[in-house]
């Protein structure tokens, strides 16, 4: 099973790429974390926000594996603790489908992507820069996985 972080935005600071990769490489071969960064639609075109998000939606959909579970990261999503995320991860693993975690661009995700999600999760009550989101999500997933296997990385 793969965990696919599909995020709008390609250029992030080097520290964010390094931190993300540090967590991604810790996952076992049967539970890989993979990043698919899709291009942000240029905000200088004068197009309405809905058109910009629709263009990004098309790119996100092209990156989605067939039959995957879609999990939207959204400010209105459900709050989860590390233990709850570990439980979700175990459910996802039993299900066997790849899991796509979707992170929108500067204006968020197109409404049809949000409506079509299997799950909606909230990473934080704060508005976070995209670089932080990638790193925090990778760390949270790694922490959840270590909790589920009894690894000492996570401590209560």
From Swiss-Prot:
Q: What class of enzyme is it?
A: transferase
Q: Name one Pfam family in it.
A: SPOUT_MTase
Q: Which UniProt keywords apply?
A: Cytoplasm, Methyltransferase, rRNA processing, S-adenosyl-L-methionine, Transferase
- Any idea where this protein resides? Cytoplasm
Q: Which GO terms describe its molecular function?
A: rRNA (pseudouridine-N3-)-methyltransferase activity
Tell me which NCBIfam families the record gives: PRK00103.1-4
Relate the protein's function as given in its record.
Specifically methylates the pseudouridine at position 1915 (m3Psi1915) in 23S rRNA.
Query: Which protein is depicted?
Result: Ribosomal RNA large subunit methyltransferase H
Organism name? Leptothrix cholodnii (strain ATCC 51168 / LMG 8142 / SP-6)
């Amino acid at each position: 099973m793969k965990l696919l972080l599909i995020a709008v935005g390609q250029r992030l600071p080097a520290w964010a790429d390094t931190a993300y990769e540090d967590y991604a490489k810790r996952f076992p071969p049967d539970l890989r974390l993979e990043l698919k960064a899709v291009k942000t639609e240029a905000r200088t075109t004068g197009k309405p926000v809905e058109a910009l998000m629709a263009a990004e939606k098309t790119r996100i959909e092209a990156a989605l594996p067939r039959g995957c579970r879609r999990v939207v990261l959204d400010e209105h999503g459900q709050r989860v603790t590390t233990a709850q995320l570990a439980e979700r991860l175990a459910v996802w693993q039993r299900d066997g489908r790849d899991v796509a975690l979707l992170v929108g661009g500067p204006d968020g995700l197109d409404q049809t992507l949000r409506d079509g999600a299997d799950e909606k999760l909230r990473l934080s009550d704060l508005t976070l820069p995209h670089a932080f989101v990638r790193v925090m999500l990778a760390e949270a997933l790694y922490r959840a996985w270590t909790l589920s296997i009894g690894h000492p990385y996570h401590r209560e």
